Amino acid sequence: MNLENIKFKVRFLKFYTLFGLFGLTVEFIVRYFVLLIFSNDFFATFFGIICGVLFAYWSNIKFNFQIPSYRLKRALILFSLIGILSKFLQSLLSSAIGIDEFGYELQRLLTSSLIFIVFYFINVQFTFANRTQLGIAIYANNNEDLENIYSKVLDSPDFIQVDLVDKTVYKNALEVNISKINSIRERWPEKFIEIHLMTNDLLAWEIDIQNILPLVDMIIFNKHSYENNLQIIKKLKSKKPSLETGVYLDSSTNTEEIKKYTKICDQITIMGIENIGYSGQNFLESTIETVKKIDKFENRNKFKLEVDGGIDSTNYHKLRVDKLVSASSVLNSENSIKKVLEFKKL
């Protein structure tokens, strides 16, 4: 684990601790005033704990952990249950170590500090486990310097996206070097690798794709490939049953059309840029609204949602999706690992 990764893990812990203290403060204040009004200790304590837990949850979701919108309800339930369990164990601990005679606030502070780290790791492993993932895009051509890219990001990305672009999609595309995928797998042997297949002639790539199937975990096609080449896609799936498939769509794609693909794809990739095939483009703000519409789909938990292109420090936090893909914003920064960890959340 590199130094930047350690720094960010410590940062998560520091903010979690801070928000936990703020949550306890909210709990104490609410309990005090409810007790003044109703003179019911149980109700005041219960209501205070609920308010404190909700505040701590909101603070962590807003500032510390970024998870997809459709998972927020699950995260809230888990966080609340863990918070209530924490209070129950703290009550037992108070009796066990003989601090029942202390005031409520001091009891809570002492017992919370004793079991705090345990519940931090429980929340990280369960409540906030499904955070937004960050992938690095690498083009499958001879222009990409893999050694340079690897030295910049090391193992910090959650996954690698390999962009295979031909001239049927982008007229200035460089010649594809399919062997690049072998080199990428060698450098990131444990990472999830997805192929972003940007071509309007899937048939021309059928043999090459079959050859690299053992190296990849997902292939993302364009909508024309899905509509016109389902037989090829089914053949690929039959050769590698674990292969996941996705479709990439413009942010302007009709909502009903997007729904159609959610029923046959493992992943929907929304392009955050206007023209596919090259990096360094500005982000399309319409992407944010498209993501919000997709988040309302009834089957939202049945597929992954990814945004690819234009991701930078001004917009990543507006996109509560399963996956984000970036290239130039990360690789052109002074500290690429720090930028990756920032996008992974922050």
Model-identified regions with their sequence ranges:
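Catalytic cores of alpha/beta
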Residues: 148-152, 201-213, 252-263, 309-324
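Alpha-helix-loop-beta-strand connector modules within alpha/beta enzyme cores
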Residues: 174-195, 239, 246, 286-305, ...
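Glycine/small-residue-rich loop that forms an oxyanion/phosphate-binding "nest" at active or ligand-binding sites
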Residues: 173-229
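Histidine/lysine/aspartate-rich catalytic loop segments that bind and position anionic ligands
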Residues: 248-290
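Glycine-rich phosphate-binding active-site loops on the catalytic face of alpha/beta enzymes
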Residues: 219, 223-225, 270-279, 321-341
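Glycine-rich, proline-tolerant flexible connector loops at the mouths of alpha/beta enzymes
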Residues: 161-178, 272-280
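Short, Lys/Arg-rich, polar N-terminal cytosolic tail immediately upstream
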Residues: 1-9
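Hydrophobic faces of well-ordered beta-strands that scaffold small-molecule active sites
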Residues: 132-138, 160-162, 191-197, 217-221, ...
